[in-house]
A protein has these predicted regions:
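Active-site neighborhoods and metal-handling regions in enzymes and metal-associated proteins
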Residues: 1-610
């Protein structure tokens, strides 16, 4: 009945872990190296990478979006964060790799405990940031060992059937969606470069390239990125380094008006030539590959470090992008609510599966006529699978959604006017008292973020406890951030702002972030409630001395009333739910079909009714 066109459920190819690790050790020995540290990354430090950059998955079998392995002569470890500990345990051969929670033991600490004096640890300078490489070098030095560049990457030497780099077509991102011409953006960037007293800014982040030049690509699944570099001087045209096979004549003609187009293969040579002149290049040490700094400095140039100015420009949406976000979330809300109504009809018989749910939801989004892609592979977790934070269902793991279980669905869409990301946890049948209690604790944290009022300069780290306070009081917590930034028809995970213990960037008006506290009971169920929120001007307070900010909730989808324990909520919390549901109903009713309208009317009734 339904099908998924933008995501597959194929099982990951079983990694021949033992033979591959032994082949890697042989290659390292041939190069005189004791070991190798390998993160899941590419030259651009992307979170989502092309298939040809999936070295970590090829070597270890782990397919999560974040992780690092260290392979030494006699041992190996895979480092993952709390989102992926359960997934890694099912995908990785524990007889070869020790699975380590990076929050408890980061790689540098592990290296200090396991490297032998005089050891030579290889690293690919393209896959580590400047900061990251320096941290590793210190850890090696403390252990009496040495960090050694390993180029070309040793894994590439043994990965004989490695896929070719992608050649995805580049499209122009129209002004009616971008809200600012590329020429204007580049002028702003040039001004920043001049203010920084640099001779050039190297743009290595494809998100920044896409934003600055008003282009989108198809080199990375679910994120419309063109893999490219750029160099922007304080005056004159920037240079855009991109494979010309990705550019149609029309796109190339448009770009040539604002940039000098170069082949990707020219980038290293021209960056080296730039360094030979002794000029100063600006790099973001937290996001730029260590290889870039090495190229500039070894050729005689200078590197100044600091935050990429484009990251903040991109994160603060302009009025056109904000209006696009409203339109995208309304459209997405219609599709998501249609799905939830359908789910309530189909799930109680116990025959509906996790894959069938994903296929239906994607189909409903495609029915809008404007879906370009999903924004990430949908997380469709029934019962115990919901406790795997970034669970990805495959044909081997697919299971029915059974009565008496919780079903967690985390998904999103890519539209030219905006990117969406939403999680709902749904009761199938009658939930237990514990499920209702835990869900309500999560909901209280979600509401606390949604209702937050905060002064200019407030960071995500300062807001993060709002989402956890009620869970903490019950001796509970969740092992992931509360929120991440979201792009405008770009990545569903966008920096620099986030709501987490590590979120040190002040939140600014125009930023879009997620609000997604959760709770996960291993082997039983998972709970997460996620809406996207927009930072807006806060209320005017009589006698107040500081400008205030607040959040506007963008997502328009009901929250499952069956899981809410009303007695645990304050008057203000109940009021927030009622106002939110009234807003959802008013927005979605006119655009919903008859069956969905009936369901929506019941789903948005005041608490205690129905």
């Amino acid at each position: 009945m339904f099908e998924a066109r933008f995501q597959s459920f194929d099982d990951p190819e079983p990694a021949q872990t033992g033979p591959r690790v032994e082949a890697l050790r042989a290659e390292l020995a041939r190069r005189g190296l004791t070991g190798l540290i390998l993160p899941r990354a590419d030259r651009h430090q992307n979170e989502y990478v092309p298939r040809c950059e999936e070295r970590l998955a090829w070597l270890t079998g782990f397919t999560g979006s974040a992780g690092t392995t260290v392979v030494l002569e006699d041992r190996a470890a895979l480092f993952v964060d709390g989102r992926y500990t359960l997934q890694a345990a099912t995908q990785v051969d524990s007889s070869v790799f020790a699975i380590v929670n990076v929050g408890e033991t980061p790689p540098d600490k592990w290296l200090g405990q396991n490297l032998k004096p005089e050891a030579k640890l290889g690293y690919d300078p393209w896959l580590h940031t400047v900061d990251g490489a320096e941290k590793l070098a210190r850890a090696c030095a403390d252990a009496g060992a040495t960090l050694v560049p390993a180029e070309p990457n040793p894994v590439d030497a043994i990965w004989t059937d490695r896929p070719a780099p992608p050649i995805g077509a580049v499209t122009l991102h129209d002004f009616r969606y971008a809200g600012e011409y590329a020429s204007s953006k580049l002028n702003r960037i040039r001004t920043e470069v001049a203010n920084l007293r640099a001779d050039a800014l190297v743009i290595s982040d494809p998100h920044a390239v896409a934003w600055a030049f008003n282009i989108r690509g198809s080199d990375v699944a679910h994120t419309p990125l063109p893999i490219a570099f750029a160099i922007v001087p304080p005056e004159g045209k920037p240079a855009l380094y991109i494979d010309s096979a990705k550019l149609s004549n029309a796109v190339r003609h448009n770009l040539e008006e604002i940039a000098n187009i170069r082949e990707s293969a020219d980038f290293i040579r021209e960056l080296t030539a730039f360094g030979l002149t002794g000029k100063t290049v600006r790099l973001d040490q937290a996001t730029a590959a260590d290889a870039l700094a090495r190229i500039v400095t070894t050729s005689g140039g200078k590197v100044t470090r600091g935050a990429d100015p484009i990251a903040l420009m991109k994160a603060v949406k302009n009025p056109v992008e904000i209006e696009g976000a409203h339109e995208a979330h309304l459209r997405d809300g219609v599709a998501m609510t249609r799905f939830l109504a359908w789910l309530d009809r189909e799930a109680p018989n116990g025959a509906l599966t996790e894959i069938a749910a994903v296929e239906a939801l994607e189909s409903f989004r495609r029915d809008t006529g404007l879906l370009k892609d999903v924004s990430f592979p949908s997380i469709s977790g029934a019962g115990p699978d919901g406790a795997i934070v970034h669970y990805r269902v495959t044909r081997a793991t697919d299971r029915p959604i059974k009565p008496g279980e919780l079903f967690l669905i985390d998904s999103g869409g890519q539209y030219e006017d905006g990117t969406t990301d939403i999680t709902r946890t749904v009761a199938v049948g009658e939930p237990t008292a514990e499920m209702r209690e835990r869900f309500t604790l999560v909901l209280k944290g979600h509401i606390a973020i949604a209702r937050a009022v905060f002064p200019d300069g407030t960071t995500g780290a300062q807001l993060d406890p709002f989402a956890r306070q009620h869970l903490w009081a019950a001796g509970l917590d969740f092992d992931h951030g509360t929120g991440h930034g979201v792009g405008s028809y770009l990545s569903v995970h966008e920096g620099p702002a986030r709501i987490s213990k590590l979120g040190n960037t002040p939140l600014k008006r125009g930023m879009i972030l997620s609000n997604e506290p959760g709770y996960y009971k291993t082997g039983e169920y998972g709970i997460r409630i996620e809406n996207l929120v927009l930072v807006v001007e806060g209320p005017k307070v009589e006698g107040g001395e500081k400008p205030l900010n607040a959040f506007e909730t963008l997502t328009l989808v009901p929250i499952d009333r069956r899981l809410i324990e009303m007695s645990m909520l304050s008057y203000d919390e109940i009021s927030w739910i009622e106002i939110y549901h009234a807003r959802v109903a008013a927005a979605l009713m006119p655009q919903s079909d008859d069956q969905t309208r009936d369901w929506l009317a019941a789903a948005t009734l005041p608490l205690g009714q129905g």
